[in-house]
């Protein structure tokens, strides 16, 4: 066993807390107004119809309905359509 830690080993051993990002409600999922659909960093996916965006880029439903993902002009959008 080494009596001294190897060079740099004492400076390792940290990790950041989990951020729980990603899609929270998938395609065709029924959501109520205010339900978080996606948590993200930046506009990886843009808000479509009946979807709002929080200041941390969280996308959430503005109405009750079904979630629908679509691509337009090389951009991904998520929309909520009423039943």
Swiss-Prot record:
SUPFAM superfamilies: Ribosomal L27 protein-like. The keyword Ribosomal protein applies. One of its GO terms (cellular component) is cytosolic large ribosomal subunit. Coiled coil: none annotated. It comes from the Bacteria. One of its GO terms (molecular function) is structural constituent of ribosome. One of its GO terms (biological process) is translation. Residues 1-21 are annotated as: Disordered. This is Large ribosomal subunit protein bL27. It comes from Kosmotoga olearia (strain ATCC BAA-1733 / DSM 21960 / TBF 19.5.1).
